[in-house]
Amino acid sequence: MHLIAVSINHRTADVALREKVAFKDDAIRSANVDLYETKSILENVILSTCNRTEVYAVADQIHTGRYYIQRFLARSFGLDVEDIKNMTEVKVGDEAVKHLLQVTSGLDSVVLGETQILGQIRNAFFLAQEEDTTGTIFNHLFKQAITFAKKAHNETDIADNAVSVSYAAVELSKKVFGKVNNKQALIIGAGDMSELSLLNLIGSGVTDITIVNRTLSKAQDLAMKHHVKFEPMESLPRLLVDVDIVISSTSSENYIVTNEMLQSISTERKHDSLVMIDIAVPRDIEPNIDTIHDMFSYDVDDLKGLVDANLRERQLAAEQIIQNIPNEIEAHNEWVNMLGVVPVIRALREKAMSIQEDTMDSIDRKLPGLSERERKIISKHTKSIINQMLKDPIKQAKELSSDKKSNEKLELFQSIFDIEAENAYEAKKQKNNMKTGQILSFE
C-alpha cells in the first residue's frame, strides 16, 4: 500500500486556476465517496480551501493511484487530465507524510504559521471519517498530524507575530492600548486592505467600527457585509473626535487626514490617545502629526519593520518545527510496520487458543468426572503453558516489523506456524482485482 498526496496550491497554480478546482462545501462529502469508489483507492481525504485543493490517499499502487486521483480531479472540474497534471504536486510515501505535517502546522501556507489551516485539516478529516472513506492508516495519521501541529503551535511562537500589513496595523494598536475590544475604530477606504484590516479588528474583539469612503455605496456594501457602520467621507472630521484607532487605505493622491484637520479637533478630544495607521501608498495621513499631543501616526515603513522582524521570528520557529518532522515520520513508519505484525500475532494467538479449547474438549471426554474446580485449574494451566510458549515467537514477530525484509520474513513466520493473517483491506483489494492474502507493504 502507498501513501499519496496530490496538491494544487499557491505554488502550482495562480488564484484564477485555484478558483476552478475548489470543491464547494456541500460537495466535499459526495466527492470523498466518489473518489473512494474509484479503482486503486483504499482510503482518502479531500481538503479544499481558498489556497489549496488536495487529495490524500492510500492506494494499492503509486502510478495507478496517482492516475485515478488526477483523473478524478479532471472529471470533477471539467478539465483535461493534462491540465490537472500541470498544476499538481504529487508526493508519495514519507514525502506525503511530510507534506501533511507541513500543511497542518502552517509551514506550507501563504502566511507562514497561520493556524486556520489546522481547523480546515481537522474538518476535512472528520468529513471523510463520517463518509467512511478513511481507515486504519488515515485514522491514525491525521490524528498524529493534528496533534503534531497543536504541539508545534503551543511550543513555538510561530503564530504569535503579525506578518501581514493589515494584521500588523491591528497588532500595533494593541501595543499602544493593550486591549482594543473597548475601543472605537475608523477605517478610511473600502478596498481589499481595508476589508482585511476590518476583519482583523473584528477578530480582536472591536465592535464599534465605522467605514468612510469617497464612494459611499462601497462603504455601505462593506459595512453591511460585516455588520458595522458607515458614513460619507464628509463626516471624517466629526468622527475623528471620538475614535481611538484610525486605519487608512485609499488610492487618493492627496492627504485624507491633514495636520490642520487634527489641530482643529484636538481640544475636543480631551487629550485621549488617537492612533492613526496609514497603510496607503501614497500616504493618506499627513506626516509629523506626532507633534500634536496624544496623537500617534505610523506608516507602511513603520509596519514593514514590525512585519520583517515578526517574519524572522516565525522563520526561526518554523525551523524548530521542521527539525521535529523526521521524528514524526519515523514514528508513523514504526506504527505502520507494526500493522503487518498485529494480524499475524492475532492469528497465532487464535490458533493457540483453538488448540487449547480442543485440548479441553478432549479432556472433558476422557475425564467426564472432573469437578468444575478441577476443570478450571486444568484450563488455567493449559492457557499458561500456551502463553509461555507464545512469548518468544510474539517477541520475534514484533522485532521483524523493523526488519527491511519484514514482509518476506512475516510470510515465512506464518508458514512455519501454519497461520494466515487477515488483511484489513481484503474487501477493497478484491474490488480492485488484487491478489488476496498478502502482508501489507506501506511506503
UniProtKB/Swiss-Prot annotation:
Binding sites annotated in the UniProt record for substrate: 49-52, 109, 114-116, 120
Catalytic reaction list: (S)-4-amino-5-oxopentanoate + tRNA(Glu) + NADP(+) = L-glutamyl-tRNA(Glu) + NADPH + H(+)
Keyword Membrane in annotation: no
Active site residues according to the UniProt entry: 50 (nucleophile)
Matches recorded under Pfam families: GlutR_dimer, GlutR_N, Shikimate_DH
Residue(s) at site: Important for activity: 99
Family annotation (InterPro entries): 4pyrrol_synth_GluRdtase, 4pyrrol_synth_GluRdtase_dimer, 4pyrrol_synth_GluRdtase_N, GluRdtase_CS, GluRdtase_dimer_dom_sf, GluRdtase_N_sf, NAD(P)-bd_dom_sf, Shikm_DH/Glu-tRNA_Rdtase
Keyword ATP-binding: no
UniProt pathway: Porphyrin-containing compound metabolism; protoporphyrin-IX biosynthesis; 5-aminolevulinate from L-glutamyl-tRNA(Glu): step 1/2
GO molecular function, one term: glutamyl-tRNA reductase activity
EC number in record: 1.2.1.70
Gene Ontology biological process: protoporphyrinogen IX biosynthetic process
Cysteine pairs bridged by disulfides in the record: none
NCBIfam families assigned to the protein according to its UniProt record, in alphabetical order: hemA
Assembly and oligomerization: Homodimer.
Domain notes: Possesses an unusual extended V-shaped dimeric structure with each monomer consisting of three distinct domains arranged along a curved 'spinal' alpha-helix. The N-terminal catalytic domain specifically recognizes the glutamate moiety of the substrate. The second domain is the NADPH-binding domain, and the third C-terminal domain is responsible for dimerization.
Protein name: Glutamyl-tRNA reductase
Species annotation: Staphylococcus saprophyticus subsp. saprophyticus (strain ATCC 15305 / DSM 20229 / NCIMB 8711 / NCTC 7292 / S-41)
Source lineage: Bacteria, Bacillati, Bacillota, Bacilli, Bacillales
